[in-house]
């Protein structure tokens, strides 16, 4: 039987907790419940949100689901589906504007990772990318340099370094994706990072980090102390 959120203790209601503690204090299902606003006769908004995430596997997958897939759930109709599409598009436009700024400052590893996830989203093959930064951690240029298969991408250290020098980079972040599976680095990934780090040191470019991004998460070489201590990691 549906227990209305209105009957919950105030400190447990998602909207009240969001206002008091901030959105980061809420789970994916609680945030989705605030968006849904109402559930169905059988389920509260939070219960419906949990069912949706369980069914589709993640919050992202809920937003990517078709109308026919979502309409199977009581409480989801054309109105809520159109709202989902609108919120998804608003998020995309926000990121497009934010990351297209010419003076984009990437002064923390969190911001760098967000930017790289944005640039590499949707790639179905391995892609190796380079982010060039100036001395103040402002973006100079970003480029996807090498493309491979689902499981492998051949990378040239010389071409990577040449590109960084052409952009007058003072600092560098490299990244590649694992389209499927774990973000854990392979022995080849570790060897490549070491080679690039050594090459960067020769031309006085600081390699700040190497990120691996996958559907299961991300891996930072700097955070795992797999870069030389003389390199300055993004704080």
UniProtKB/Swiss-Prot annotation:
* A molecular-function term among this protein's GO annotations: metal ion binding
> What InterPro entries has UniProt attached to this entry?
MPN, RadC_JAB, RuvA_2-like, UPF0758, UPF0758_N
Binding of Zn(2+), residues:
176, 178, 189
Q: Which CDD domains has this protein been placed in? A: MPN_DUF2466
Keywords, comma-separated and alphabetical:
Hydrolase, Metal-binding, Metalloprotease, Protease, Zinc
Domain (MPN) spans 105-227
| Zinc found in the keyword field | yes
Q: Where is the composition biased (Basic and acidic residues)?
A: 9-18
Residue positions of motif JAMM motif: 176-189
Task: Map out region (Disordered) in residue numbers.
Answer: 1-20
Q: Cross-referenced Gene3D superfamilies, in alphabetical order?
A: 5' to 3' exonuclease, C-terminal subdomain (1.10.150.20), Cytidine Deaminase, domain 2 (3.40.140.10)
* Swiss-Prot/TrEMBL GO biological process terms: proteolysis
Give the family, as the similarity comment puts it: Belongs to the UPF0758 family.
Name of the protein = UPF0758 protein A1S_2918
Q: Which organism's genome codes for this protein? A: Acinetobacter baumannii (strain ATCC 17978 / DSM 105126 / CIP 53.77 / LMG 1025 / NCDC KC755 / 5377)
